[in-house]
């Protein structure tokens, strides 16, 4: 039987419907592009699934979809974002990420060159996070039926013994820690989407937080009540969600919340509130007061936590409000975002 040609015309070629048909062209795409980008022992077996060994203990699993527009943005692209976002969802349980799956829905006519860049960035992000993309799927839809490329992922990880992070564990007096500046990702996406040029380029904060989380857990142990990554809806949505789940409220100090000057200026120009803008490389931790100092020091000692800050505390509040003392000496309620401020941000 004649072997199929594995070589794709990466420079000039485009995806067509045959690349999702299950035939020779699809085999070329998988072997010549995805396997080269993600290559590992599991994918090399060519099965429709991947088997892996697990040790006794608690596992976590997550799933996510990525429809960001534009596909390429300052600081990353949909591929690196898909890995970072999935790894971070696992890491917020204090877990070590292990394995990912990735499914691609590709629009007919999508350039191989762009797909290769995206796949390579996924592979690089996975290697950096010490995770493996061990199974996946590819579908191709007609022109006009998708906006270039959508990615769906799933991931699994293992939780360290004795660690159980949950909003139910939050208590009055717990400190609210943020790992760095807010709004970088959302403003980077919006500036690229609207072709806005600022004096200082605003770059997405998209990054995998697993190593930062491991350092925090080592420093704070069971003093860490829970962690969340403030993605869509930003810090405001995250803290409102935690307030509802924990039956508490939060008091924040605006002056303590880190926002880069360029991001603050861009938000003012665009009519955005940094507290509502998405982040893809930050986390919020609710930490017992006796552990907060050690956890904050561990965060600041890590490259992804240099701008970490203690921004407030958990309080008793039957209404579960998130309130903030403003820099002008007043106060305001930080509510959920109403409507859609930044669509297709991740």
UniProtKB/Swiss-Prot annotation:
Its EC number is 4.2.1.-. It comes from the Bacteria. Pathway: Protein modification; [NiFe] hydrogenase maturation. Modified by HypF, which adds a carboxamido group to the thiolate of the C-terminal cysteine, yielding a protein-S-carboxamide. The carboxamido group is then dehydrated by HypE itself to yield a protein-thiocyanate. It is an enzyme of class 4 (lyase). One of its GO terms (molecular function) is lyase activity. The modification S-cyanocysteine is found at residue 346. The modification S-carbamoylcysteine is found at residue 346. Keywords: Lyase. It catalyses: C-terminal S-carboxamide-L-cysteinyl-[HypE protein] + ATP = C-terminal S-cyanate-L-cysteinyl-[HypE protein] + ADP + phosphate + H(+). One of its GO terms (biological process) is protein maturation. Involved in the maturation of [NiFe] hydrogenases. Along with HypF, it catalyzes the synthesis of the CN ligands of the active site iron of [NiFe]-hydrogenases. HypE catalyzes the ATP-dependent dehydration of the carboxamido group attached to its C-terminal cysteine to a cyano group. Belongs to the HypE family. This is Carbamoyl dehydratase HypE. It comes from Bradyrhizobium diazoefficiens (strain JCM 10833 / BCRC 13528 / IAM 13628 / NBRC 14792 / USDA 110). The gene is hypE.
């Amino acid at each position: 039987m004649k072997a199929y040609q594995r070589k794709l015309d990466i420079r000039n070629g485009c995806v067509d419907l045959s690349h999702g048909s299950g035939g020779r062209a699809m085999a070329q795409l998988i072997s010549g592009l995805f396997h080269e980008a993600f290559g590992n022992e599991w994918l090399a077996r060519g099965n429709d699934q991947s088997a892996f060994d697990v040790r006794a203990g608690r596992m976590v699993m997550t799933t996510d979809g990525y429809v960001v527009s534009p596909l390429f943005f300052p600081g990353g692209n949909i591929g690196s974002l898909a890995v970072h976002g999935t790894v971070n969802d696992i890491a917020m349980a204090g877990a070590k990420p292990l394995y990912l799956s990735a499914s691609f829905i590709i629009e007919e006519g999508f350039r191989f060159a762009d797909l290769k860049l995206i796949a390579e960035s996924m592979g690089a992000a996975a290697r950096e996070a010490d995770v493996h993309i061990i199974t996946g799927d590819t579908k191709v839809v007609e022109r006009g039926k998708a906006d270039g490329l959508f990615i769906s992922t799933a991931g699994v990880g293992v939780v360290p013994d004795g660690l159980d992070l949950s909003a139910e564990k939050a208590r009055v007096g717990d400190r609210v820690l943020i790992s760095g500046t807010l709004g970088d990702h959302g403003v980077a996406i919006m500036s690229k989407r609207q072709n806005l040029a600022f004096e200082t380029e605003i770059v997405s904060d998209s990054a995998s937080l697993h190593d930062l989380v491991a350092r925090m857990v080592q420093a704070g142990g069971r003093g860490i009540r829970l962690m969340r990554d403030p993605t869509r809806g930003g810090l405001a949505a995250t803290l409102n969600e935690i307030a509802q789940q924990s039956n508490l409220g939060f008091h924040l100090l605006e002056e303590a919340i880190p926002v880069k000057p360029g991001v603050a200026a861009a938000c003012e120009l665009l009519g955005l509130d940094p507290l509502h803008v998405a982040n893809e490389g930050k986390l919020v931790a609710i930490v017992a007061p006796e552990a907060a100092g050690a956890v904050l020091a561990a965060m600041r000692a890590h490259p992804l936590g240099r701008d970490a800050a203690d921004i407030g505390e958990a309080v008793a509040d039957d209404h579960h409000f998130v309130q903030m003392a403003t820099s002008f000496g007043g106060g305001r309620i930080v509510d959920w975002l109403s409507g859609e401020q930044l669509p297709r941000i991740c």
